[in-house]
Amino acid sequence: RKEGKDFIVDGTQSEKVFLNSLSRPRKVMLLVPAGEPVDSTIKKFLPYLDKDDIIIDGGNSHYDDTERRYKYLKEKNIKFIGAGVSGGSKGARFGPSIMPGGDRDSYEIIKPIFESVSAKVKGEPCVTYLGNTSSGHYVKMIHNGIEYGIMQLISESYHILKNGLNKENIEIHNTFKKWNDGMLNSYLVEITRDVFKVKDEKSDNYLIDLILDKAKQKGTGKWTSQSAMDFGVSIPTIDSSVSMRIISSFKETRVKAQKLYSKKIISSTSSIKSDDIEKALIFSFVITFAQGLSQLKVVSEEKLYNLNFEKICKIWRGGCIIRAQLLEDFMQAYRKNSSLDNLIFDENISEIINK
């Protein structure tokens, strides 16, 4: 796919010159940090915008902020789209998964652009209109919550392989390679597989053994947990993953506690095989997606998003961080029953879980 290396981009030095250079209705996409930077950028742009121009917020904005901005701009006759974007650096180069929400007529105007730049799976763009106001950013928040959960599950699987089964890094690489060739085929398992082979250029030691076990977070996982509690939805895997990130950040406290308590060897892991861990991870992948999607189901009904869950799973299949082969199974489940309360109630999904 062309990356636009020969594409000419004109730079400007002022908001006025930039906005006057755009065709009408203007379509302005913001990719700035969530919070105040979004509001300040909108404030700077407003004097140079006309009726029915469209502002697109492509950052990880909180859904409450998106609703506030939508109402504020509507009063000024400016269209607003809150669009979740997933894909990282690869998504920027080869096409992301895009999750837009707002007015349908506004989306129809930007639809050709989004479909052109988004990732493609089987020739189909990984973007679709999701629903009103904050639906796009809410779906992206849930996407990130699921991502948190899966990353924690992968981390714990690695820990058992490394410290429970005493496997070497190359063995773990081969194990993850086998997993990724099967039902666990996914972006996160794929990149984790590759990490185990990487060596540090300075010491020639494996990089995985040198990485500080201290994770940071941008807040979207926390927002997912907070919102689930507000709406009375249980998402224990995602909640636990957020807590584990917080625990990991207290490195000094953990080291201090480690000195006070002796490390005991647990012999019960001797009966566990990597195939057992694979089965547990498949089960946990399904459950994590089920938790996130069940939260979306409840909130969609509360906020009248009218989300199409088959389409959500469809656009998550490419360009995004939680891309996974299992999404094909989830799509089929929602195709059979669009009002499915929880994935675990689908017959085919229950067969996967029972294995």
Where are these regions (language model features)?
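Rossmann-fold dinucleotide-binding core
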Residues: 38-43, 56, 62-174, 182-210, ...
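Conserved N-terminal Rossmann-fold NAD(P) cofactor-binding segment
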Residues: 1-27, 31-49, 68-77, 259
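Membrane-water interface at loop-to-transmembrane-helix junctions
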Residues: 271-282
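Glycine-centered, small-residue-biased loops immediately flanking beta-strands
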Residues: 53
